[in-house]
């Protein structure tokens, strides 16, 4: 095979059909090789070379144009280079000329920075130590609102800061100047606030009826007044920093409320309520208890309303006042704030209580005068004590209203009047019992019960203790309150009982029965109140036991005399035990036998139940049974002692067993039965 052909064939076979170059070549060929004719195939090579030549010519044309552009760019670059050289030369020249200017600019820049720092410092200083125009305006504008109090607080902050600076830096002169300006602002502001507060107190607190509801509901009447009411506690709170002005405001409140309370009390006494409802209190002047109760009830209601009213007004006040020295107010506040150990020796009082105490001082005189008039009408002991109980009740209620905030003046007034009533009460008791003792009534020998005077005194005691028991006195204080009032009264009744008994000239046994009946009546009254009458019950029990011993001894002696062995027992009791009883006069065997027979007959006739007329007169059934039993026991013991003496061989009685019909145990059984 022809080698040329072989190379061509081999070349064709070596062609990679998936070659990207082959694909691109064929794709380009399809753009101009549209007809597959013989002529086209023959001219294909020429056509391709022609196209290749055209492409090179186009490339050459483009390259010529690019070359021209590059040459132009080179020329432009040369121009720019020359311009830059000129600029650099100019800049170097300018730099040499303006170096001094730059130096000055740098110095000015540093100076500007320092000025800005000083400006910031001054702004901070003014912000810290100087009021803004708005704040200064809030201190002088007509209406006092929240901005006024904010400025006051700001003044206090500046003042405190100045005081700190006086201790911590060397700029004392400007600090003093600022402090002087701030103090002047403060003084003017507080004086203005004081005047405003004083006027508001006069306008808002002069109301006819001191009821807090009307005070709180002022917004229904007028919106402006509501705002003033809301600002009043804030104003008083701010004035705490000026103790003297604050005290004057408290005095102003007290004065306004004093007028209102005084007028209200006199109106309630003389005219009553609107349209006569409720009726005037003095319409019940004929009934001391009702009269006093109505007056105290009005004061109590008024105190409750006033306490709520003043508590609202002073709700933001936190300081306390020294009650012992009201003049030195600054010292009071300073001591209170320091809260040092010396404060334990001072008597501090809440401002609320101070205002209430001053306000209610006006009721002291009219109330005292009317109670003195009641006492001058000489009411009974019961009425007087009920008045005392009413005063004690409302005194304790007054202390409950003030919640232990301090000494309530109303309670003190009631306590003082109560002391006067107690003096009258004790005088009445003394006069009453002195009158009874001057002409004592003697007991009836038939029943030996308490006389009418003693019964009346015991009934009074019962009513008095019942009144005392219904009081508000705490259980742990009742005995302490009871003793000084009632112990003397009970002792007076006992003394009257003793005086009546001794004046009656009754036998000792009858006097003992009478005393027991009287004392047991008193004891029966006290036994209902054992929680606080224990001391008196113990005293009465001891006295009753003493009189019971007398009664039992006398009744036993009387019965033994009636039964015939009384004389024998007397001889037996006083014998000297040196000689036999049988040799003593009236103690021979025959006399003993006769006495024993008489004793047995009396006992047999009464069937063991002896008549004890004096014991029967005891009104208390328990004491009556106890006395009878005691008498029977003594009789049994007496019989036993006589029986033992007769059977004693030393006494030389013949056949002692034949003398006695009954043994002691039998006698005891008969008496017990």
Swiss-Prot record:
This is Conserved oligomeric Golgi complex subunit 6. The keyword Protein transport applies. PANTHER family: COMPONENT OF OLIGOMERIC GOLGI COMPLEX 6, CONSERVED OLIGOMERIC GOLGI COMPLEX SUBUNIT 6. Required for normal Golgi function. It holds the Pfam family COG6_N. Belongs to the COG6 family. Keywords: Golgi apparatus, Membrane, Protein transport, Transport. The keyword Protein transport applies. Component of the conserved oligomeric Golgi complex which is composed of eight different subunits and is required for normal Golgi morphology and localization. It is found in: Golgi apparatus membrane. One of its GO terms (biological process) is intra-Golgi vesicle-mediated transport. InterPro entries: COG6, COG6_C, COG6_N. GO terms for cellular component: Golgi membrane; Golgi transport complex. Coiled coil: none annotated. It is a peripheral membrane protein.
């Amino acid at each position: 095979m022809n080698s040329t052909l072989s190379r061509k064939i081999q070349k064709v076979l070596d062609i990679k059909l998936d070659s990207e170059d082959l694909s691109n070549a064929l794709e380009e060929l399809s753009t101009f090789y549209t007809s597959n004719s013989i002529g086209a195939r023959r001219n294909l090579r020429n056509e391709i070379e022609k196209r290749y030549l055209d492409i090179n010519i186009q490339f050459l044309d483009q390259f010529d144009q690019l070359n021209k552009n590059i040459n132009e760019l080179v020329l432009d670059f040369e121009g720019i280079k020359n311009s830059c050289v000129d600029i650099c030369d100019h800049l170097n020249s300018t730099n040499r000329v303006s170096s001094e200017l730059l130096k000055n600019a740098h110095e000015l820049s540093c100076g500007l920075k320092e000025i800005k720092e000083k400006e910031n410092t001054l702004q901070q200083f003014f912000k810290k130590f100087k009021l803004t125009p708005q704040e200064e305006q809030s201190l002088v504008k007509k209406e006092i609102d929240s901005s006024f109090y904010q400025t006051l607080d700001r003044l206090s902050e500046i003042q405190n800061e100045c005081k700190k600076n006086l201790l911590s830096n060397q700029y004392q002169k400007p600090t003093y100047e600022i402090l002087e300006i701030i103090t002047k602002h403060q003084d003017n502001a507080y004086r203005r606030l004081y005047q405003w507060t004083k006027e508001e107190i006069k306008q808002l607190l002069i109301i006819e009826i001191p009821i807090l509801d009307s005070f709180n509901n002022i917004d229904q009447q007028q919106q402006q007044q509501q705002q003033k009411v809301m600002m009043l506690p804030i104003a008083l709170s701010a004035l705490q920093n000026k103790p003297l002005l604050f005290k004057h405001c408290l005095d102003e409140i007290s004065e306004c409320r004093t007028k209102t309370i005084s007028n209200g009390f006199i109106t309630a006494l003389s005219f009553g309520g609107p349209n006569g409802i409720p009726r005037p209190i003095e319409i019940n002047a004929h009934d001391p208890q009702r009269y006093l109760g109505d007056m105290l009830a009005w004061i109590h209601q008024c105190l409750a309303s006033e306490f709520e009213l003043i508590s609202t007004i002073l709700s933001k006040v936190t300081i306390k006042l020294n009650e012992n020295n009201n003049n030195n107010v600054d010292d009071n506040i300073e001591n209170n704030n320091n809260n040092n150990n010396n404060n334990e020796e001072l008597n501090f009082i809440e401002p609320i209580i101070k205002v209430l105490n001053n306000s209610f001082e006006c009721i002291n005189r009219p109330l005292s005068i009317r109670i003195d008039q009641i006492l001058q009408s000489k009411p009974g002991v019961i009425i007087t004590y009920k008045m005392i109980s009413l005063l004690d009740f409302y005194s304790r209620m007054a202390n409950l209203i003030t919640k232990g905030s301090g000494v309530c003046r109303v309670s003190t007034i009631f306590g003082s009047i109560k002391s006067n009533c107690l003096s009258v009460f004790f005088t009445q008791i003394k006069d009453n019992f002195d009158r009874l003792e001057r002409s004592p009534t003697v007991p009836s020998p038939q029943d030996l019960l308490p006389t009418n005077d003693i019964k009346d005194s015991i009934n009074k005691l019962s009513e008095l203790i019942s009144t005392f028991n219904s009081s508000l006195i705490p259980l742990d204080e009742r005995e302490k309150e009871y003793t000084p009032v009632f112990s003397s009264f009970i002792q007076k009744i006992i003394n009257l009982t003793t005086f009546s008994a001794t004046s009656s000239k009754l036998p000792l046994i009858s006097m003992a029965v009478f005393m027991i009946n009287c004392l047991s009546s008193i004891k029966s009254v006290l036994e209902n109140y054992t929680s606080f009458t224990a001391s008196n019950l113990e005293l009465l029990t001891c006295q009753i036991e003493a009189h019971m011993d007398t009664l039992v001894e006398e009744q036993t002696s009387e019965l033994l005399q009636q039964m015939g062995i009384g004389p024998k027992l007397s001889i037996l009791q006083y014998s000297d035990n040196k000689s036999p009883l049988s040799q003593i006069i009236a103690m021979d065997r025959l006399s003993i036998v006769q006495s024993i027979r008489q004793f047995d007959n009396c006992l047999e006739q009464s069937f063991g139940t002896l008549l004890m007329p004096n014991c029967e007169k005891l009104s208390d059934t328990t004491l009556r049974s106890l006395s009878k039993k005691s008498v029977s026991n003594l009789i049994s013991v007496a019989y036993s002692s006589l029986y033992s003496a007769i059977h004693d061989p030393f006494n030389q009685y013949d056949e002692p067993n034949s003398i006695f019909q009954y043994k002691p145990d039998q006698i005891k059984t008969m008496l017990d039965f």
